[in-house]
C-alpha cells in the first residue's frame, strides 16, 4: 500500500495544497510570471511543466485532464492555443525560477517563477553545427573514394591516373567553395 510523503503540506491539508498549486499554475499561465515564496515556486514548477507538456500534445483528452486542475476555461484555451505551441521545439524546461529579495513582513525567501519565452540559442547552434559536419562528411566521402580508386588505377593504366587526379582536384576545389 502506498504511503504518503512525510512532512508538512502547503496549506495544511492535501486538498488545500492541491488548490494552492492549481491557483499558482493558473496565475502563472494567465500572467506569464508570478512572485511567490521560494518553496512554493520550486513545488509548483514540475506541476506547471506537466500541464504545459499536455498542452503541447493538444489532444481532447489532455485538455480535459488540464480542465480538472485549472478551472478557468480562458486560461486553458490560452495554454493550448498559445503557450503549448510556443514550446513545440523544447523538451522541458518551460519555466525559470529567479530568487529575489526576502519578503518585508516575515523575511520569507521570495522567488519569481516565469515562463521561458525566448528560443534557445544553443539548440540552433548545435543544429547548424551538425548540418555543417554532415555536409563536410558527405564531401569527404567522394574524395576518399577517389583517392582509394587512384592507386588501383595507377596499376592498371597511367591514363586513368590523370583522370583520378583531375577528380580529386575538382573535389578539393568544390570543398573550398563550400
UniProtKB/Swiss-Prot annotation:
InterPro entries from the UniProt entry: Ribosomal_bL17, Ribosomal_bL17_CS, Ribosomal_bL17_sf
Chain's gene name: rplQ
Protein name: Large ribosomal subunit protein bL17
Comp. bias intervals (Basic and acidic residues): 126-139, 164-178
Binding partners and assembly: Part of the 50S ribosomal subunit. Contacts protein L32.
Ranges of compositional bias, category Low complexity: 140-163
NCBIfam families: L17
One Pfam short name: Ribosomal_L17
Sequence segments annotated as region (Disordered): 126-178
